[in-house]
């Protein structure tokens, strides 16, 4: 049978399976592909194919992640599953696999365990909007009261981390049964997919957000003016648009785009994902620098103080060999810019060990255009020692 091209007209959503080790995350991922494949909405992926997740390098950090994709009647999903707990922490904190929602898998035989709690906390800290619970292995629990108890504990845990514990769907099923084609458990997998379709919100597409392009390079064309190049992160820009240059010492200088070029062709507009050159009226070459951002006027502010969730690399990952203490001053690589900043640790935290994840406050030495959810790397002498994302703007 010919391979069909994935239908891109359906809205695209990124999700993942999270939860404690051996509770059935990977088996559930395999079961979803098996059940949807019968409806022609997925390709079957076996447990082993998913479990042997390839290594990926994301901002200098190696993470094992398996990616599968499938569709429901209304949506197209990209689904991530990680083999090890450390991979989850790295993935969620660095935003390597951005999640619009997640399936938290909990075994009915155990109930919530330490990593169940830790993954829900991480989901909260990196602003995953909603979770759906899949209570797995219910086929090997004889006592219905046990199932009620696990459900109650999960709802309390969700409430504690400010997910809607009362209304979050909890589906009781058997991932193994679903993967093996037992109709009773296959129906539960479909019930789970319906819950995901209805409970997890559609993300706002990058193109619908306001225009922002980090500057990568700048050059001048004699007789025409200054061109700033970069990859448009969000939104659209058209010839004739008024724009503002932000960050470093730009002081919010305004200009007008007199041309949008891509591969030496003149375009009417550039949109999210395009690598373009913007011809800027009335701007000298030395007024725009790599690391600044170009936006529509008054949409983005430069900031110097933010809160962030970070993962610090282990020695084996090429990170630091020693812990760092309060007031540590590394470089933060934000978009296209390296900027020095000072780290303040949370109260009661003396130091941070390689391999830890921690919430920190960062004070940058000069203002940088940034926003919640923005990812960055932490560097020291040109090598990556950590990564994270901004969770709150302070000033």
Swiss-Prot record:
Residues 19-26 are annotated as: G1. It comes from the Bacteria. GO terms for molecular function: GTP binding; GTPase activity; translation elongation factor activity. Residues 10-204 form the tr-type G domain. GTP binds at residues 19-26, 81-85, 136-139. Mg(2+) binds at residue 26. Residues 174-176 are annotated as: G5. PROSITE patterns: G_TR_1, G_TR_2. It is an enzyme of class 3 (hydrolase). Coiled coil: none annotated. Its main location: cytoplasm. Residues 81-84 are annotated as: G3. Its EC number is 3.6.5.3. It holds the Pfam family GTP_EFTU_D2. Residues 136-139 are annotated as: G4. The keyword Aminoacyl-tRNA synthetase does not apply. Keywords: Cytoplasm, Elongation factor, GTP-binding, Hydrolase, Magnesium, Metal-binding, Nucleotide-binding, Protein biosynthesis. It catalyses: GTP + H2O = GDP + phosphate + H(+). GTP hydrolase that promotes the GTP-dependent binding of aminoacyl-tRNA to the A-site of ribosomes during protein biosynthesis. Belongs to the TRAFAC class translation factor GTPase superfamily. Classic translation factor GTPase family. EF-Tu/EF-1A subfamily. This is Elongation factor Tu.
């Amino acid at each position: 049978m010919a391979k069909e091209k994935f239908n891109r007209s359906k809205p695209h959503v990124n999700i993942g399976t999270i939860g404690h080790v051996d509770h059935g995350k990977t088996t559930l991922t395999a079961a979803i592909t098996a059940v949807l494949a019968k409806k022609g909405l997925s390709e079957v992926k076996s447990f082993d194919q998913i479990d042997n997740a390839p290594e990926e390098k994301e901002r200098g950090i190696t993470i094992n992640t398996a990616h599968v994709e499938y569709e429901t009647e209304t949506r197209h999903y990209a689904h991530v599953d990680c083999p090890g707990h450390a991979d989850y922490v790295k993935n969620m904190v660095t935003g390597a696999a951005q999640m619009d929602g997640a399936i938290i898998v909990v075994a009915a035989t155990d109930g919530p365990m330490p990593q169940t709690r830790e993954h829900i906390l991480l989901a909260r800290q990196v602003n995953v909007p909603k979770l759906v619970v899949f209570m797995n292995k219910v086929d090997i629990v004889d006592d219905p009261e046990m199932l009620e108890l696990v459900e109650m504990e999960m709802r309390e845990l969700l409430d504690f981390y400010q997910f809607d514990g009362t209304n979050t769907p909890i589906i009781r099923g058997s991932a193994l049964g679903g993967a093996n084609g037992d109709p009773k458990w296959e129906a539960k997998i479909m019930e789970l997919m319906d819950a995901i379709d209805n409970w997890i919100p559609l993300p706002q597409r990058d193109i619908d957000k306001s225009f922002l392009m980090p500057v990568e390079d700048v050059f001048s064309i004699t007789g025409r003016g200054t061109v700033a190049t970069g990859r448009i992160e969000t939104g659209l820009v058209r010839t004739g648009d008024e724009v503002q240059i932000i960050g470093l010492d730009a002081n919010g200088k305004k200009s007008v785009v007199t041309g949008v070029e891509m591969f030496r062709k003149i375009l009417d507009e550039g949109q999210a994902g395009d690598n373009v050159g913007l011809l800027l009226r009335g701007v000298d070459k030395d007024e725009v620098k790599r690391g600044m951002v170009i936006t529509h006027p008054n949409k983005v502010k430069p900031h110097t103080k933010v809160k962030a969730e970070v993962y610090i690399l282990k020695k084996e990952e090429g990170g630091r060999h020693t812990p760092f203490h309060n007031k540590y001053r590394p470089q933060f690589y934000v978009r296209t810019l390296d900027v020095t900043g000072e780290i303040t640790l949370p109260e009661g935290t003396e130091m941070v060990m390689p391999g830890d994840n921690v919430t920190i406050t960062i004070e940058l030495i000069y203002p940088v255009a940034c926003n919640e959810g923005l990812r960055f790397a932490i560097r020291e002498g040109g090598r990556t020692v950590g990564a994270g994302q901004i969770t709150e703007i302070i000033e």
